[in-house]
Structures are given as C-alpha cells and as structure tokens.
C-alpha cells in the first residue's frame, strides 16, 4: 500500500489527547502534528504522546520548532541550545565546526522521542531590522549563512533528520513580525538573488524541505509565497532547482491574510505547498479539512521523505561520548 499523507498539519491543546483530538487525527486529510511548549512536560511524556497518536494513525509526521535560543519548545530533559548566531560566533572564535555537532545532538534528542521534523535551520539574513529574526539567523552575511547552515544540515543528516530551511525567500529584510502583521519587502528579485536567496541556491542539494515566509514581496508578486505559484513553482523549483517538500508557515498568523482559513489552506496547496499548517484554531482547522474533502484534495506520498531515517536510543544518547563532548562546548558558549 502506498504511503499517503494528508496535506494539513495541525496542533493539539495539551499534554495528552482529548476525544476531539482522536477524532480529528483519524481524518485522512491530517498528515502532521506540530508540538508547542504547552504539549511538553518531559521526554517520556512526549514520547508516550507520540506513540498514542501513532496508534491512531501511522502515516503522520511529528514536527517542532527547536531552533535553540528564543525558539526551543522542549526544555526539561533536553539540552538547552544556544541561538544559531551564538553558535556561529563561537565556531568562528574557536575554529571548530560546532554547528554540525550541535545540530547532531539537537536532532538526536528529538528523534529519540519520535519527532520527525525540526523546522530548522533558519536561512534568513540578520539585517538588523527584523523584530522577529535577529539572532535566530546565523549571520548578516549570505556567505556565512551558507557556511554554517551547511554544517548544521550535515549534523541533522548524520542524526537521521531531514532539514527544513526557512523562511523562504527571506524574512530578515523587513521590520515587522508576520505573526502580528503583514510585512512588505519592496526589493527586486535581482536584489534577493544577490542576498537572501543565495543560501537556497548554494544549499539546494542539501535542503530537504522549505518553509515559506509570510512576507509580501510587492515588486515581485501580489501573493505571499505560500499562495504564489510564481514563488514556489517558478522561482523555487524552476530557477533554484529545488525538488523537496514545501511547507506553508502557520496560516493563523496575521501575515497569512484575512481570507477564510479553508481558502488560505486550499490556495497554499494550489500554489505548490505539500503541507499547510493551521495552528491554535481547531474550528478553522476542521473547516479546512471539510473543504479539502469537498474539493477532493489528494493525499501526498512526498511527505514520507520527511520521516526519520534512523535514531539513537535516549539512554544511549545520554552516555554517548559525542553528546557529552558537545555539551561541554555548550557550557562554554553559555559562560
């Protein structure tokens, strides 16, 4: 039987499943779950929750934002990770490839509890203007971002996790936070190819997935990337040559627009997104699921590519010499 996955990724409210959760998870249009801090208590709890969900549905991927620094959903039991920018500075100062090692440890911990996807690394440039990116980015230099992100992705792959580059084509050049507004970037496509898009061009053969930015590039297209065939089909796939998975960012963010959620979700799929995220609004997620069923949205076998390729047991990881070595470096970064 072909491994088909639904095209909607959604969230759950707490640390255990409700009857409503069990009902919606059984729907064929649901192909992914993203976890937040509210869903997490310990590594044993999240592992048990994932096992329970898998007993309801096998063809589903589990995702989290575990970049490090400001964005780390799982903390208790997990290694506290520094921001990507702190990693790059430490790596340069000490002439060591710490990005690869930290990515390996971060990915290994997530894989050990059943997480398939960490939405990382951030490929945005820190242009000292964005209120939401900042030190989530490796650097302000596209060359530096390529160098450090390449190592980071190598570490993810060694652990058995696929990479997800974000936020395509770039969120670092705008001031506004797309969670609470729609940022507008007036640069030309040539400008972007000479800056923000360079990491995607250089790393296209390493990147497994891309998450789209909720930013309006008004001199390039009237649609944000998640709804844009120009951005996804023409620029990302044809011009850059990307052949991986495309995720929308969360459609409940203000930057995703004011249309009905089922229209936003459907438009993202029409534009070329393989999976669309609807978080923190269960009723609208249900509406989108119903609309997908009415419109005959087909499940996808591409999502299978994002499943983990291997993993190390949690207890074995705890005593791994490699893990202990990485943790020593992390103590130095924090000190």
Task: Name each model feature, range by range.
Residues 12-27, 98-109, 194-200, 260-267:
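Short, acidic/polar
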Residues 32-38, 116-122, 272-276:
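Divalent metal-dependent hydrolysis catalytic cores, especially in the metallo-beta-lactamase
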Residues 118-140, 169, 173-185:
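Short glycine/serine-rich loop/turn segments
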């Amino acid at each position: 039987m072909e491994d088909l996955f639904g095209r909607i990724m959604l969230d759950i409210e707490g640390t255990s499943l409700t009857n409503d959760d069990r009902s919606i998870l059984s729907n064929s249009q649901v192909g992914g779950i993203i976890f937040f801090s509210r869903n997490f208590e310990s590594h044993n709890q999240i592992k048990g929750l994932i096992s329970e969900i898998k007993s309801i549905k096998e063809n589903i991927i589990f995702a989290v934002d575990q970049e490090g620094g400001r964005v780390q959903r799982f903390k208790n039991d997990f290694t506290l990770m520094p921001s990507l920018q702190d990693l790059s500075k430490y790596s340069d100062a000490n002439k060591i490839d710490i990005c690869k090692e930290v990515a390996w440890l971060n990915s290994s911990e997530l894989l050990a509890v059943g997480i398939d996807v960490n939405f990382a690394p951030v490929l945005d440039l820190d242009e000292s203007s964005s209120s939401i990116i900042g030190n989530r980015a490796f650097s302000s230099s596209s060359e530096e971002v390529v160098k450090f992100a390449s190592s980071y992705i190598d570490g993810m792959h060694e652990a058995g996790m696929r990479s997800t580059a974000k936020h395509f084509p770039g969120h670092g050049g705008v001031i506004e936070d797309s969670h609470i507004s729609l940022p507008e970037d007036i640069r030309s496509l040539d400008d972007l190819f000479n800056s923000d898009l360079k990491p995607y061009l250089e790393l296209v053969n390493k990147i497994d997935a891309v998450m789209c930015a909720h930013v309006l590039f008004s001199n390039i297209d009237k649609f944000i990337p998640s709804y844009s065939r120009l951005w996804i089909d023409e620029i990302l796939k044809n011009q850059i040559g990307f052949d991986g998975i495309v995720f929308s960012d969360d459609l409940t963010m203000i930057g995703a627009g004011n249309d009905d959620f089922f229209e936003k979700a459907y438009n993202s799929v029409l534009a070329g997104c393989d999976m669309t995220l609807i978080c923190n609004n269960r009723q609208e997620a249900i509406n989108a699921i119903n609309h997908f069923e009415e419109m005959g949205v087909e499940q996808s076998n591409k999502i299978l590519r994002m499943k983990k390729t291997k993993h190390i047991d949690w207890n074995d990881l705890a005593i791994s010499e490699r893990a202990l070595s990485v943790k020593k470096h992390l103590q130095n970064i924090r000190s």
